[in-house]
Regions:
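Conserved helicase ATPase core of P-loop NTP-dependent helicases/translocases
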Residues: 198-204, 381, 393-430
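Conserved segment of the helicase C-terminal RecA-like domain
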Residues: 461-495
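Conserved SF2 helicase motif VI
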Residues: 265-266, 449-473
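A short beta-strand element within the Helicase C-terminal
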Residues: 229-230, 424-425, 432-447, 456, ...
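Conserved interdomain hinge at the start of the Helicase C-terminal
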Residues: 330-372, 377-385
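Post-DEXD/H (motif II) to motif III coupling segment of the RecA-like Helicase ATP-binding lobe
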Residues: 238-303
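Conserved Walker A/P-loop ATP-binding site and its immediately adjacent core
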Residues: 142-153, 157-180
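Walker A/P-loop
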Residues: 128-150
């Protein structure tokens, strides 16, 4: 078979296929959409498959590496048109010019020097133009983005860069770091910049050299706004499966570089994995948390303690088990409803609540408590108890709290050498991208199943700080198990086990503990 690019470089046309090759490509490039099984239960005739190859044998150019891998796997012959390589890669890119530039940029910086993996990662980006990087949280992704921007701005015609982030904190934090790096490097910030998010000052025109914006705010901009950008950089590109980010990428029609970076890329072969590649490009560089800690020694080792709590009596466990027994029989929504009931039981348990608060109050170092439920006030309840019953400095943060207050909370913890600060925050505000080096403990008090979120939570602890040799993540699980059949394991317990396997697969030291609050007189 032969691969040729369309005139606009958006698609690969695959020709000269045998019937066997065509059928296999159709199978390999067809993925089930998220939650397909729920849709199928609701409507057995629903189409839950999405094909990334059309009837004309065309695939998005970003999936070129998947095409190569499929052909290798099934021993298919594959040739490319003569111009293919230099249209997906930057064949004119000069390696020496890049490495000399980076060396010169940081020559007077006595505090920060790029690691080899950071320089290599950006070298690969400049070589491939449309691609993704998977670099562990705390791996210095913002510094890598800075290196990319500075090189393009000073050495190419790319003068307008769009920097897309998932929340307002990251927009402001990223800009502040860019300016800080300039100051450390003793170079002028000779470029214009702006922020676009819910708390940023509005401007009549945005024609800056670099714009830091949240995808929630950027998606409201008109098509013409995006035509100015030569490069678009998606921070935490695991979110790129969201329609808002896909629309942003579609509108950046003149972007010569489309780059995505994340700490946890979706699993190989999944719909989420393919959709990100189709809009941005393949993962061309990886650097794991294990490598970050054990090879480059740029991150703090994290010890994970999984604490499974038993606090529900037999009668309530039987009621929960009966609910689980009916899942799949009545309505497809029942599984979600049972999970909601389990979460409500966990939130309403006074034994569980006291255990968590006592655990937090006894910590001797700065601690972040992460919760998921805002509507029912679980995090606020923990905050109020700690505020009233401890002598620690306690802060509360959720999506409704102002940026100024959040920054004050972060700075208070960063400056606290006594280790006497606790921040109680929602997972979606402080679970991702927040940079606090002087953080020693994280307590996860509400369940999450997301692989990428687990990676982000661990990353909060991996920042290096002179006061810590290691950090601790305490993961709270809930045991409502009863019986010996396949319905014995409750949903929150399953999530707890999934997270445990996730920690282990990432190479973190994991220890599990079982605490029976019905028998233990803790208070």
């Amino acid at each position: 078979m032969k691969a040729t690019l369309t005139f606009d470089d958006k698609f690969i046309v695959i020709s000269d296929l045998t019937d066997i090759e065509r059928k296999q490509l159709q199978l390999s490039f067809t993925k089930k959409i998220p939650n397909w099984f729920i849709i199928k239960k609701k409507n057995p005739f629903a189409n839950v498959d999405l094909s990334f190859i059309n009837s004309s044998n065309m695939i998005p150019t970003g999936l070129w590496m998947e095409l190569v891998n499929i052909c290798k796997k099934f021993n298919f012959s594959l040739t490319f048109s003569s111009d293919f390589n230099c249209r997906i890669k930057n064949c004119e890119f000069n390696e020496k010019i890049f490495y000399d530039y980076i060396s010169d940029l940081f020559k007077s910086n006595e505090k920060i020097k790029p690691e080899n993996y950071q320089t290599k990662g950006i070298y690969n980006v400049l070589s491939y133009k449309n691609c993704c990087l998977e670099v562990s949280t705390s791996g210095g992704k913002t510094l890598m983005a800075y290196m990319l921007f500075k090189f393009l701005y000073d050495n190419s015609e790319c003068k307008h860069v769009l920097y897309v982030v998932p929340n307002t904190n990251l927009a402001t934090q990223s800009l502040d770091k860019f300016l800080k790096y300039d100051d450390m490097n003793n170079v002028d910030s000779n470029y214009s910049y702006s922020e676009i998010h819910s708390e940023a000052k509005k401007k009549k025109e945005y024609n800056d050299n670099i714009i830091f914006g949240t995808y929630q705010s950027l998606c409201k901009k008109k098509k013409e706004f995006f035509e100015q950008f030569d490069c678009v950089f998606i921070d935490e590109c695991a979110h790129a499966k969201a329609d808002s980010i896909k629309n942003i990428l579609k509108k950046c029609v003149n972007a010569k570089y489309k780059v995505g970076v994340t700490g946890t890329f979706p699993k190989d072969g999944t719909y989420e994995n393919f959709i990100i590649q189709s809009y941005i490009g393949p993962v061309i560089f990886k650097y794991s948390s294990y490598e970050l800690i054990n090879e480059s020694h740029r991150a703090t080792p994290v010890n994970v303690k999984g604490i499974l709590l038993n606090y529900v009596d037999i009668e309530k466990k039987e009621a929960l088990r009966n609910l689980r027994m009916n899942v799949g029989k009545d309505t497809f929504e029942l599984g979600g409803k049972v999970l909601s009931v389990e979460k409500e039981v966990a939130r309403n348990s006074q034994l569980r609540f006291k255990y968590i608060c006592d655990l937090a109050s006894k910590t001797t170092k700065n601690t972040l408590i992460l919760f998921g439920d805002i509507q029912n006030g679980y995090g606020r309840k923990i905050y109020n108890h700690l505020k009233e019953n401890t002598d620690k400095s306690v802060f509360y943060v959720d999506g409704g709290i102002s940026n100024d207050y959040r920054d004050n909370a972060k700075q208070s913890m960063e400056n606290d050498e006594t280790g006497n600060t606790i921040i109680v925050a929602s997972i979606f505000t402080f679970g991702e991208g927040i940079d606090i080096s002087n953080l020693h403990n994280v307590i996860l008090v509400e369940s999450t199943k997301s692989d990428s979120m687990v990676g982000q939570i661990i990353g909060r602890l991996m920042r290096k700080h002179e006061s810590k040799e290691s950090a601790i993540l305490i993961d709270i699980g809930d045991d409502f198990r009863l019986g010996n059949d396949n319905k014995k394991n409750n949903y929150l317990y399953k999530h707890f086990i999934d997270r445990a396997n996730n920690y282990k697969s990432r190479g973190f030291n994991y220890e599990s503990y079982y605490v029976n609050l019905l028998e233990t007189n803790l208070f």
